[in-house]
Structures are given as C-alpha cells and as structure tokens.
Amino acid sequence: SLESITVTAYQYRDNSLYVQASRGFMPDGNVVPQVAAPGVQIRIPLLNGLYGNASGTSLSAAQTAGAAALLFEWAVIRGNQPYFTGSSVKNYITRGAEREERMQYPNRDWGFGRMDLYHTFELLA
C-alpha cells in the first residue's frame, strides 16, 4: 500500500548490505526498499537469560517499526501533528535517511538511504 514502508538490512559496523536481502524496484516503478536499517549480527535475547546474534530483514523491520512508533508518539500523543498518518511516517523516515555522496538515490539497493532517526527528528524541529 502507499502507506507501508519497506526496509532492507545492512551491517551497521561497515555499512554493507545484507547479502540475503532482496533488491530492486517494483514493476510499477515504486521504490523498494525505501530505507535500510541495521539487520546483520544484531544482539538478541534468547531463552534462559542468554543472548545471541541474529541477522535478517525482520530485525530491520522491527527497528523501523520502533522508529514509526516514536514518530507517532511525537506527532499524535504529544500533539505536534494530530493527523499524522502512515504516509507521514514513510515521508519523514525517507527524508531523514542518511545518504552517501557518491551514490544516486533512490536506488535498488539502499532505497533512499540508511534510516537515521536522529536526523529525521532534526527535520521536525
């Protein structure tokens, strides 16, 4: 849908894309993914109080969902933009994405760039 946001995974230590992540644009020309979020060798809780590492776009999606929740809190709960929508989230997250100067955006690998929630909130200030 127009309000959904697609995300790919990257290794935050060296900014390399997750090799198993899909790449490319949709047949209708829509950009997917829209952003990249950390999703490689992420520390996760395991059973019995243990921790381990995991990789995958589901971890990137979880971080992006958390970012969306923070944006909705800022907009709706705190009264800054009471009519905030999913499209608003996508717009702010893609506008706030970090981009490499040597690349053209959007592109089939990174979409609009690496999600940068701090920069997104700077745009809102």
Regions found by a protein language model. Give the residues of each.
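Catalytic-core environment of secreted peptidases
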Residues: A9-A62
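C-terminal domain-closing interface element
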Residues: Y105-A125
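Residue-level recognition of conserved structural "scaffold" positions that shape functional pockets
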Residues: V31, Q63, E73, Y118-T120
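Divalent metal-coordination and catalytic microenvironments
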Residues: V35, A67, G111
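Hydrolase catalytic cores
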Residues: G39-Y105
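Subtilisin-like serine protease catalytic core
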Residues: S1-E3, D14, R23-V32, W74-Y92
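Short, flexible micro-motifs
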Residues: P27, L59, A69, R114-D116
